């Protein structure tokens, strides 16, 4: 049977504090009203004095109630059955006793106290039942232990008898085993002569076994030098491949470096002195950019020159002659080239460039032809023919600078897209 839930009376008393305070307020309010009625009554002097004494006693009870603690009221109500009439009739009763009795008799508090009393009583009964069950269980356990002791004694006796019987059987078996021992000895003596004859061929076979490891060792030795030679060749291949990789990496690194000498700078200044009104800073940076471009183009065509296509062998001769002519004509023009404006090229050029533009043939589109990779044979031929026609036409009909400037301006204006958005109007 399971133990009942523990009832902590102190916790219940603490929970009752709120109820006791609420009931105390109600009782004090009632007593104050009764005191007011007693004082307002009129009559004879004896009746007035009697009413005053009652009112005085009620005031004392009110003061005692205010000083009382709620826990005292609940404990006294739980401990005894309080009768308010008996306590009031006592001549020596104090104001505190009367106040406790008055509060305990209140119907709201009395209900709570009755519930607590019933819970305490049921808890006590449950505890008593648990004690009785435990005592009965202990008695049954004692009886069971006595029975087990008796059964253990019987089992020990049976085991002792069984051991005695086993010992007797073992003795009998030993006596029977001694008799056939003599017969077995004679059989063993006969069997000893057989193994001696069998040992002779075994001894002859042993030296042949010794020769086998020697032959296996001789087989292993010739294979060792071959393995060593293979391992050496593998190591040599790995080292050579690593050296090739390192050398390729160094060559690429040297090609990527930008080579810049004083001799190239002096040569560039000599060539640029031919043009008029040229700035030294711009020429310096332009030369550097040109050299970088030439290096990139040479790197591109170095791979293609190793495997040139057969179809382009005849065209290379024509292009070389054409490029030599163009380079001789446009040499001072290209060396004095500057970064030009995106929108109006005429604004960025100097006066010397304008004079050179009048005198010299305009630059053709085929100047940087060698930088473009030929994709197809037909395109290559068409571009070469266009370059020849343009140079002939421009050399025959040189335009005035003002006409050329207006033409360029119109081209730039035609490239600018027209505004296609909506106009925003701001209303009042």
UniProtKB/Swiss-Prot annotation:
Crosslinked positions (Glycyl lysine isopeptide (Lys-Gly) (interchain with G-Cter in SUMO2)): 190
Q: Which domain of life is it from?
A: Eukaryota
Alphabetically sorted, this entry's keywords are: Acetylation, Coiled coil, Cytoplasm, Isopeptide bond, Phosphoprotein, Transcription, Transcription regulation, Ubl conjugation
Q: Which residues carry this modification: Phosphoserine?
A: 203, 205, 263, 278, 280, 348, 350
Its function?
Answer: May be involved in regulating transcriptional activation of cardiac genes during the aging process. May play a role in biosynthesis and/or processing of SLC2A4 in adipose cells.
* One Gene Ontology CC term in the entry: perinuclear region of cytoplasm
Q: Which GO terms describe its biological process?
A: maturation of SSU-rRNA
Q: Where is this region: Disordered?
A: 132-155, 175-284, 350-428
Protein encoded by which gene: SRFBP1
The chain residues annotated with the modification N-acetylalanine are 2
Q: What compartments host this protein?
A: Cytoplasm, Perinuclear region
Coiled coil feature spans: 45-72, 109-130
Q: Ranges of Polar residues compositional bias?
A: 213-222, 373-396
Q: Where is the composition biased (Basic and acidic residues)?
A: 184-196, 352-371
Q: What is this protein called?
A: Serum response factor-binding protein 1
Assembly and interaction partners: Interacts with SRF. Forms complexes with SRF and SRF cofactors ARID2, MYOCD and NKX2-5. Interacts with the N-terminus of SLC2A4.
Record field: compositional bias (Acidic residues): 245-264
């Amino acid at each position: 049977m399971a133990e009942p839930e523990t009832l902590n009376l102190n916790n219940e008393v603490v929970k009752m504090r709120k109820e006791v305070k609420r009931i105390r307020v109600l009782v004090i309010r009632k007593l104050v009203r009764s005191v007011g009625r007693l004082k307002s009554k009129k009559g004879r002097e004896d009746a007035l004095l009697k009413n005053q004494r009652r009112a005085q006693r009620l005031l004392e009870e009110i003061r005692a109630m205010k000083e009382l603690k709620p826990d005292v009221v609940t404990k006294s109500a739980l401990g005894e059955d309080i009768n308010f009439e008996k306590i009031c009739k006592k001549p020596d009763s104090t104001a505190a006793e009367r106040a406790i009795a008055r509060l305990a008799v209140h119907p709201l508090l009395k209900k709570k106290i009755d519930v607590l009393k019933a819970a305490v009583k049921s808890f006590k009964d449950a505890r008593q039942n648990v004690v009785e069950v435990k005592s009965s269980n202990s008695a049954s356990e004692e009886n069971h232990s006595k029975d087990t002791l008796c059964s253990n004694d019987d089992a020990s006796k049976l085991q002792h008898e069984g051991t005695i019987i086993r010992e007797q059987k073992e003795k009998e078996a030993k006596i029977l085993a001694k008799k056939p021992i003599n017969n077995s000895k004679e059989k063993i003596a006969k069997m000893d002569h057989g193994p001696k004859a069998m040992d002779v061929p075994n001894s002859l076979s042993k030296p042949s076994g010794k020769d086998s490891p020697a032959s296996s060792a001789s087989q292993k030795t010739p294979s060792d030098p071959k393995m060593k030679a293979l391992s050496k060749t593998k190591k040599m291949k790995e080292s050579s491949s690593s050296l090739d990789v390192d050398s390729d990496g160094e060559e690429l690194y040297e090609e990527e470096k930008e080579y810049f000498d004083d001799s190239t700078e002096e040569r560039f200044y000599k060539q640029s002195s031919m043009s008029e009104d040229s700035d030294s800073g711009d020429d310096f940076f332009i030369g550097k950019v040109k050299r970088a471009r030439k290096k990139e183009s040479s790197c591109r065509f170095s791979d293609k020159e190793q495997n040139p296509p057969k179809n382009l062998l005849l065209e290379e001769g024509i292009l070389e002659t054409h490029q030599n002519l163009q380079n001789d004509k446009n040499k001072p023009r290209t060396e004095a080239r500057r970064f030009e404006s995106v929108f109006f090229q005429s604004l960025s050029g100097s006066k010397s460039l304008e004079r050179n533009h009048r005198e010299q043939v305009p630059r053709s589109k085929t100047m940087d032809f060698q930088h473009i990779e030929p994709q197809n044979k037909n395109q290559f031929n068409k571009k070469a023919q266009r370059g020849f026609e343009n140079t002939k036409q421009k050399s025959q009909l040189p335009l005035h600078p003002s006409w050329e400037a207006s033409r360029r301006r119109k081209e730039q204006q035609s490239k600018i897209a027209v505004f296609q958005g909506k106009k925003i109007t701001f209303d009042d």
